[in-house]
């Protein structure tokens, strides 16, 4: 069973959450920024197999280089041309994160290279900055942001998860482990209204 912990918990700087998924393949989903991620990974698991990025905004990738240096791992992300990304992820690709088989869902709107990672069998979603707890959704006023595209991405996510969702790990704020689909539905409604 995959254990997921937020190694950015308690950090008091402008960072994203950074989720360490432990299991068959120990993976860091987003690296955060402005704290010693490598030390927190070492303390939690003693090792790392890969980094996977939901997107490449600075608050999600600021610690990537120090993590790569500490653990000599490759980085996976949607944009293979980004200097921090070693391996491109395409929509529909499957990646092992912890013990879970995750499908990459290209979900632009907040940023063109945004992906969510959904493990149907485990009922786990790494949502990045697409949606948050309590109906929040990613900003669309930043470069590459587009509200209509974000709404389409949230609707695509709802169609994909079909109710088999037990935990949603988001880019900012608390994880959602009680009825996460409801929070995605709220985000879809809120994004449509704006």
Predicted regions and their residues:
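Conserved beta-strand hairpin/beta-sheet module of binuclear metal-dependent hydrolase folds
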Residues: 1-42, 116-133
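Internal catalytic-core helix/loop-beta-alpha segment
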Residues: 90-118
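Haloarchaeal acidic low-complexity proteome signature biased toward cell-envelope/secretome components but also
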Residues: 1-14, 43-47, 180-194
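Active-site HxH/HxHxD metal-binding segment of metal-dependent hydrolases
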Residues: 31-101, 186
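Conserved beta-strand termini and adjacent loop/short-helix elements that scaffold enzyme active sites
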Residues: 7, 78, 89-91, 105-107, ...
């Amino acid at each position: 069973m995959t254990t997921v912990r937020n190694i950015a918990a308690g950090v008091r700087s402008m960072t994203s959450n950074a989720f360490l998924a432990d299991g068959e393949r120990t993976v860091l989903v987003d690296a955060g920024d402005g704290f010693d991620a490598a030390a927190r990974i070492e303390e939690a698991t003693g090792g790392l197999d890969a980094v996977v990025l939901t997107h490449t905004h600075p608050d999600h990738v600021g610690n990537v280089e120090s993590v790569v240096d500490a653990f000599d791992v490759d980085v996976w992300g949607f944009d293979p041309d980004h200097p921090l990304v070693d391996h491109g992820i395409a929509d529909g690709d499957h990646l092992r994160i912890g013990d879970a088989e995750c499908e990459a869902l290209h979900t632009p709107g907040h940023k063109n290279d945004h992906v969510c990672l959904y493990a149907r069998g485990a009922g786990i979603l790494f949502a990045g900055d697409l949606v948050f707890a309590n109906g929040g959704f990613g900003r669309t006023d930043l470069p590459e942001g587009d509200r209509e595209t974000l709404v389409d991405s949230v609707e695509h996510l709802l169609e994909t998860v079909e109710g088999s969702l037990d935990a949603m790990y988001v880019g900012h704020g608390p994880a959602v482990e009680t009825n996460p689909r409801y929070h995605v539905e709220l985000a879809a409604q809120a994004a449509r209204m704006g």
